[in-house]
Design a protein with these regions (language model features):
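Interaction-mediating elements
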Residues: 1-111
Length: 111
């Protein structure tokens, strides 16, 4: 029996998170979105990535930690890389996009 897993992250800004997902080839949908799991179960997230073979990815804001949590049904994970590797790549892209955004807002130009 599958169930949704909630993974705490340090992802705190929406724009770099969306850009990181896009950089990795995903198409995130913003706003209150359903995240599909086992046998049609759903949870609501602030940002979602629909996966063709089920097991959507969702991100919902946790006000207590001031960060987004990743919500997915890990039993339905069917991507080409393990979940842990995906999360590592997402975090790396997020960090890069956060630095680029901060540099741009400070007036630096990145080539």
């Amino acid at each position: 029996m599958s169930h949704f897993s909630t993974v705490k992250t340090e992802l705190r800004q929406l724009e770099p998170l969306v850009q990181a997902l896009e950089d990795l080839g995903y198409t995130p949908d913003q706003g209150s979105q359903p995240v599909r799991g086992y046998r049609g179960q759903t949870v609501t997230a602030d940002l979602a990535v629909a996966m063709d073979d089920g097991g959507d990815l969702g991100f919902r804001w946790n006000a207590q930690t001031a960060a987004y949590e990743l919500v997915t049904d890990l039993d339905l994970w069917k991507q080409s890389i393990p979940f842990e590797r995906f999360l590592s790549k997402l975090t790396q892209r997020y960090a890069l996009n956060t630095v680029l955004k901060a540099s741009d807002s400070e007036g630096f130009q990145v080539a």
